[in-house]
Amino acid sequence: MRTNRLPHRLLTAVAAGLLLTAAAPAHADPAPPPSPAPQASGAHGLRAFQQSYGLPVTGRVDTATAQLLRTAPDSELRTFFAAPSDLGPEQLAHARTVIGVGKGAELSEEAQVIALMAAMQESKFVNYTSAVDHDSLGVFQQRPSMGWGTPAQITHVPTASKSFYGLPSPSANPGLLQIDGWESMEPGDVCQAVQRSAYPDRYAQWEDFARDLLAQEGPDADPVP
């Protein structure tokens, strides 16, 4: 019965908040949340996600929310975040920055869609300043130990976006523009070519979402030089 589950979920959320500042796990697969989150029929967005875990319903990403967004299963996240309007204000601001960097470099909308897909899969546009998976940080979950830059550079969303796109940046890794023939590749495959994830098939699930997000936020996103 739900009356017996809420206290357990609240304790789970509090514990998750403490974990966000702890050392990263020793494996690439993030630990799943302790129990599935029940969802009210038709409920979407960050507030619904927080409510399902017994968190304060603020519509903003606090420490506990960030941890659970990182570990919740994709099937659950696709339900809560079915449309760009389901993202919170901070998440949308980061998405506009990703778009703005692409616009500032006069990159195509397709390049911007691919960057949005990668960030949505990796972080749901949460700028992680404490590592959850190994030393992965920022909206693209880039790793200092893998040559993506310093923690300060990776958690600076414009710099992280430039690294993903392959624009001049502190990164020693190839970005989108360095992937030969990326324009003719499937968008999810381009994400994987840049990110080199242990789960290469997960990017494609966000393609429609990313296209809708670009249509919603792109017109108001200022170019970022």
Language model features with spans:
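Sec-exported extracytoplasmic/periplasmic mature domains
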Residues: 51-55, 70-74, 103-107, 120-124, ...
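Solvent-exposed, acidic/flexible segments
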Residues: 39-43, 58-62, 84-95, 107-111, ...
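Peptidoglycan-targeting cell-wall enzymes and recognition modules
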Residues: 77-89, 123-187, 193-196
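Export/targeting segments at the very N-terminus of extracytoplasmic proteins
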Residues: 76-120, 124, 220
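Short acidic, glycine/serine/threonine-rich helix-capping segments at coil-helix boundaries
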Residues: 29-71
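Secretory targeting and sorting signals
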Residues: 1-30
